[in-house]
Amino acid sequence: LLLALGLLPVVCNSNYNADLEESQIEMADTNNYLGIIFVTATERPTLAATLYRTNTPVILVNRYIHSFETHTVCIDNYKGGYIAAMHLIEKGHRRIAHIASYKGTTPQMDRIQGFQEAMQCLPRGEYRYQVYFGDGTLERGNQVARELIKNGMPYTALFVADCQIAIGIVNTLREQGFRVPTDVSILCFDDSPYINQYGLRLSTVTYNPLSMGATAVDLLAQLMSDRLSSISHVNLTPQLIQRDSVMDINKR
């Protein structure tokens, strides 16, 4: 889409390295880039200060930060967390762990809030939940699964933030003789095609990343042509896709 507008995209991967992100923003500003589409922003004072200094238009994708007001294209992460918990509750689950990703990012915190509020719709004493934080890696998924198994697998269902963590969890569960979903149900907030390489048919709460990217590019085009008179916030609704990884334990 950027190429169709006659623009050359420069892709920078920070792997959530704060110093690298800030240097990339400064590079874009120094070299008079036409815009920054920022996917990995996290709430921190130094990032906000860097963004305030830049003259380059900034669009945040799938997140916002409280300390810097700018254009955003986001999934409704609160709703996504709520949908996930309610789906598991409707399938009879009352003991559910949420394996989140990076702590402190607005998508994660909004998703956790939605998840917790759905769980708290149940009568007090009828539910148990716990939030574990990760780093979006297979290794963290392996680690969480081992910890849960060591503790006697106290949950019947896991709501997992992304496919990498989910793959790590499933691999470790299978190695230890657990069956998905017979022994443990898994619902993922990510529908990456990468997961298909592992033969997994995970139920997911998902969104269309192509739509998010296209919307961000459209906002950038409007900024370039001075067609945006105010800050724009676009919220996209997540969808539940049911596959084979959630057991309806009401039928047991």
Task: List each model region and its residues.
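Flexible loop/hinge segments that line or gate small-molecule binding clefts
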Residues: Y16, F38-K79, I83, Q164, ...
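Periplasmic-binding protein-like
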Residues: D29-T40, A97-A100, V131, G152-Q164, ...
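Hinge/beta->alpha junction and helix N-cap segments in small-molecule ligand-binding domains
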Residues: V11-L20, R63, V73-I83, I99-R146, ...
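Short, well-structured alpha-helical segments in soluble
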Residues: D19-N32, R140-P154
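Short helix-capping segments at alpha-helix termini
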Residues: A4-L5, T54, M119-E126, N151-M153, ...
